[in-house]
């Protein structure tokens, strides 16, 4: 049996699956098996790699914290509720400032007491809102988002009371 024909008959997908299960040393030795294998091993798709790290996020104690992209940085937002756990009283946001040092900045926004909130599966729901222009979606849920979190320089005390803390 011609060994060159056998190696060439193995599909690239099967070959990649085999290589992913081998050690680096074994992969390096297999470059000399055939020209096709050597070209696959040198291709950018095979040699690219990503580095992942774990981040200490002790600020996120609750499962209701949502991870967000805040101006290109990792952020997390959640709501603090009153003692009954029904009405949100604070919107809290953490932003990862330094990945290496695990430094987080914390921003707390006190929600106005004048707004009537409704319990809505751990989301902020405000009573008395009207959706206009969504006739095609009458039988579906409509979500309205207020963009206070994006603008940390809001100075209107009637809307938000902000305190910025450094959390290391």
Curated annotation (Swiss-Prot):
Residues 5-52 form the F-box domain. Pfam families: F-box, FBA_3. This is Putative F-box protein At1g30945.
